[in-house]
């Protein structure tokens, strides 16, 4: 039976009206949602700049603060916008959108650090060690940061030295080279000579760098507070303040001088390891004068040395850091290849003690108990030790710490015959990196972060050159001979 034309027309009109009604509703929803999103983003920007208005006027009025804070807040705003849009997306699509946003913003942060340098370079370098907090793509980008800048004019360095000592540079040093050995965002290094003929290197802090760093840290911590509101389990506010403390510590050269003095006392009975002497009479909070150590950088040595010499040096590096950590509880916490030298007689030379870590007796005891807990697979004990060390789950869930403890026990258990050449250990180190990222809601104490930084950095060097070093026996030997 055929449908009459009139009935078909009525049905068509009804269908069209239904489509138009639904379309009108959809458009209305889109407009309403768009206004909601626009309103929330506008409110966010208003809050951000109101917060910035409370900052010291000398800082907030600088073009540098405006540039850095403006870019960081725009980045934070993209995450706020994503969180709003994600309400209307399927979960898998929202996840892909977030991953793409992470990559885009990681590149923006990297570009900002490279452009502005100053304290941002140091913040970025330190931040790259927080692998349990930052998305992997941020760690990837920030790990690339290289702190190299065009040198400051010689005359500027001379003025800095003279202002620190209150007398002409000719009365401080017998000679100081015009060309620097190195130039970075925070300091410049020149070779010089004392009046007794001793060759030294002089690390001179850049003029006005303290104000620059405070500007950078202020912008960074405010932006981190707003990010913390978006991702509270990550504890970004706490991380930003820890990073700020680390950067500020590097600006006080009396701290670094004390670190070197303590380290030299620590290695006094170890002729194979050296650190530069320091000259307090020609050092201040902003100028550090040290012994000029002649040697070869680590990577060129490893690339050109025989297998026997290469493995002997790598074994010495491993032994030295195990001794620093296990025997003394005071260690160099930034062992990248640029801070490691090979001296005459294939001795190990360490430089740049701006970043070190000291274990308190209580912390040291907890680490010793942790090793025992791992060896005996004592999960309950491991959870208690994590809590005692300062591991805190931002979600307030003890089960999270328990899962993390179980993973660490599984990860760190080694058989006595295992060495770095084993493929299995390569997998363990890879798993270790993944494990750190697995628990972003857990606040990890600074000493553990720095310890992880040491092992990851040295582990990368060892794995690249594949030495036959038995870590288990080495650590056990250090524990048995420990002095603490």
Across the structure, where does each feature detected by a protein language model lie?
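N-terminal accessory/targeting segments that precede structured cores
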Residues: 1-188, 214-236, 469-470, 474-477, ...
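Helix-rich C-lobe and terminal helical cap/extension of kinase-like folds
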Residues: 7, 47-61, 88-89, 93, ...
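Core structural elements
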Residues: 119, 183-186, 283-288, 453
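ATP-dependent phospho-/nucleotidyl transfer catalytic cores
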Residues: 136, 143-150, 162, 210-215, ...
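Glycine-rich ATP phosphate-binding loop
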Residues: 191, 198-206
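Conserved beta3 strand of the Hanks-type protein kinase catalytic N-lobe
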Residues: 192-193, 335
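Short acidic/polar mixed-charge low-complexity motifs
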Residues: 196-198, 347
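Hydrophobic residue at the +6 position relative to the catalytic HRD Asp in the kinase catalytic loop
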Residues: 338-342
């Amino acid at each position: 039976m055929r449908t009459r034309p009139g009935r078909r027309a009525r049905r068509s009109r009804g269908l069209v009206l239904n489509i138009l009604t639904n379309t009108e509703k959809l458009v209305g929803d889109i407009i309403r949602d768009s206004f909601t999103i626009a309103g929330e983003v506008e409110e966010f920007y208003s809050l951000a700049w109101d917060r910035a208005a409370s900052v010291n006027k000398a800082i907030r009025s600088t073009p540098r603060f405006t540039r850095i804070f403006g870019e960081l807040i725009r980045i934070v705003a993209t995450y706020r916008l994503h969180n709003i849009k994600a309400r209307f997306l399927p979960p898998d699509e929202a996840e892909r959108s977030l991953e793409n946003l992470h990559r885009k913003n990681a590149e923006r942060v990297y570009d900002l650090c490279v452009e502005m340098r100053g304290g941002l370079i140091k913040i970025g370098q330190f931040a790259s060690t927080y692998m349990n907090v930052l998305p992997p793509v941020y760690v990837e980008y920030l790990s690339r940061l290289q702190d190299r800048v065009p040198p400051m004019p010689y005359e500027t360095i001379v003025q800095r030295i003279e202002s620190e000592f209150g007398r002409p540079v000719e009365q401080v040093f017998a000679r100081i080279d015009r060309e620097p050995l190195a130039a970075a965002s925070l300091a410049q290094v020149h070779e010089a000579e004392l009046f007794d003929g001793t060759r030294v290197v002089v690390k001179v802090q850049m003029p006005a760098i303290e104000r620059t760093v405070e500007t950078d840290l202020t912008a960074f911590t405010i932006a981190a507070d707003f990010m913390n509101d978006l991702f509270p389990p990550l504890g970004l506010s706490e991380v930003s303040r820890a990073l700020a403390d680390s950067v500020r510590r590097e600006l006080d050269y009396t701290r670094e001088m004390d670190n070197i003095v303590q380290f030299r006392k620590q290695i006094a009975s170890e002729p194979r390891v050296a650190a530069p002497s320091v000259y307090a009479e020609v050092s201040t909070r902003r100028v550090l004068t040290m012994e000029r150590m002649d040697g070869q950088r680590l990577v060129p040595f490893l690339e050109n040395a025989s297998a026997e010499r290469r493995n002997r040096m790598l074994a010495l590096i491993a032994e030295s850091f195990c001794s620093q950590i296990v025997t003394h509880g005071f260690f160099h916490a930034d062992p990248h290849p640029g801070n490691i030298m090979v001296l005459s007689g294939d001795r190990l030379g360490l430089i740049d003690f701006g970043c070190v870590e000291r274990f308190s007796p209580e912390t040291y005891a907890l680490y010793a108990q942790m090793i025992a807990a791992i060896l005996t697979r004592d999960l309950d004990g491991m959870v208690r030790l994590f809590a005692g060390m300062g591991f805190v789950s931002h979600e307030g869930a003890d089960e999270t710490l328990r899962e993390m403890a179980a993973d660490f026990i599984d990860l760190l258990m080694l058989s006595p015959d295992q060495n770095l050449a084993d493929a299995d250990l390569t997998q363990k180190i890879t798993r270790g990196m993944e494990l750190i990222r697995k628990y972003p809601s857990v606040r990890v104490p600074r000493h553990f972060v720095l310890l992880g930084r040491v092992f990851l950095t040295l582990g990368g060097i060892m794995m690249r050159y594949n030495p036959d070093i038995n870590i288990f026996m080495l650590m056990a030997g250090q524990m048995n001979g420990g002095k603490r």
